[in-house]
């Protein structure tokens, strides 16, 4: 924000409070205040919808995106029961295992989101990669059996056909050398619908995993400890 002020940029703030809200009021910036008291990772709906609204107001987001948002909400309501069943199945398979997330190219951002949710909410290690990138290096690592690994592919209808074929060629290798392979096929017509469909599954899987472990999905004491130690260094 300070850099934006220095460049005399037009600033709109989306914040749950704190220093950002204080500065917005101090400089008379437009701001949208969202509910506080929750970690940012739990407020994706609030932050994303308001971000789209702000971008739309400045002509930086297509009007069709608002319709896609409505369709995304409808899809998640419609698929709610099916998603709940799938979430439990995935979480039970992942319990006491390490997730290996593979995006087939289109939704790497979703893979990052799910990895981070499993890291923070489930307090578990997890890694992600993409096709075809993993074919150039990581694929060579699949040479020995590791029953601690569960491969999860994130697939959308927007993935390239050749990339899908690459995955299908590699899948038997994953099945041979891991505990299990789970293919998550996104539902919906637009990228937004399909991305949020997968995000919804990933978010809840991470919370269910925390419940299976009997831990609090919200606390991040180890990060708080790191910040405290860094603060001592000045």
Where do the protein language model's features map onto the residues?
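Active-site phosphate/pyrophosphate-binding segments
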Residues: 56-150, 232-234
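C-terminal active-site/capping subdomain that shapes the small-molecule cofactor and substrate pocket
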Residues: 140, 145-222
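Hydrophobic/aromatic beta-strand patches that form the interior of the parallel beta-sheet core
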Residues: 12-14, 30-32, 100-102, 127, ...
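Glycine-rich phosphate-binding loops that contact phosphosugars or nucleotide phosphates
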Residues: 1-81, 92, 156-161, 165-180
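Short, small/acidic-rich helices and loops at N termini and domain boundaries
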Residues: 216-234
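A generic structural motif
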Residues: 14, 124-135, 180-189
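A short acidic, often aromatic-flanked loop/helix-cap motif at beta-alpha or helix-coil junctions
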Residues: 38-42, 134-136, 187-193
